[in-house]
């Protein structure tokens, strides 16, 4: 039996069921669907944006977020860029526990939700190997080494325009 990766399985499903809902997320009082095709477009944009940012095959990236569409899309984008995801539980409250995992895994990039950002900010000065912290939620301002996910997507669109 041929071994299939998560990317293989996702691509197969996106080709077979492009208009079918893949993800559901509550916005206001209703759950809204996102189709396989829409998710694939977002994953391609984010993955290309990560490559444009400098993510290379084998780089370790961390993902610290509550369960949500951006988490799934972000993880798939990491895989498309060739990175390895170092998943982190939002239940990690002790700075030393989080710091240990990030340093031990030699994480170079972090994707983090707005709710979890304070945990990363509290330790980021002890993370010199981390090049960029990608914030999943828009904020009024960003600190050193932080950038919004929207910028990654913008970079991805430019990259895909040059490298279709």
Please tell me what each predicted stretch does.
Residues 62, 109-113, 134:
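Structural motif
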Residues 61, 85-86:
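A short hydrophobic/small-residue beta-strand
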């Amino acid at each position: 039996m041929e071994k299939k990766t998560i990317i293989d399985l996702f691509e197969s499903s996106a080709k077979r069921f492009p208009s079918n809902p893949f993800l559901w997320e509550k916005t206001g009082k209703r759950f809204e669907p996102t189709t396989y095709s829409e998710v694939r477009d977002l994953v391609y944009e984010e993955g290309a944006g990560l490559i444009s940012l400098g993510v290379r095959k084998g780089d370790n990236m961390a993902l610290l977020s509550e369960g949500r569409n951006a988490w799934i899309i972000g993880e798939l984008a990491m895989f498309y860029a060739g990175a390895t995801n170092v998943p982190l539980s939002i239940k990690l409250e002790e700075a030393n526990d989080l710091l240990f995992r990030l340093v031990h895994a030699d994480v170079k990039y972090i994707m983090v939700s707005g709710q979890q950002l304070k945990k990363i900010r509290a330790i980021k000065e002890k993370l010199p190997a981390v090049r960029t912290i990608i914030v999943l939620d828009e904020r009024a301002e960003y600190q050193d080494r932080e950038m919004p996910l929207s910028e990654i997507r913008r970079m991805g669109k430019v990259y895909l325009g040059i490298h279709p």
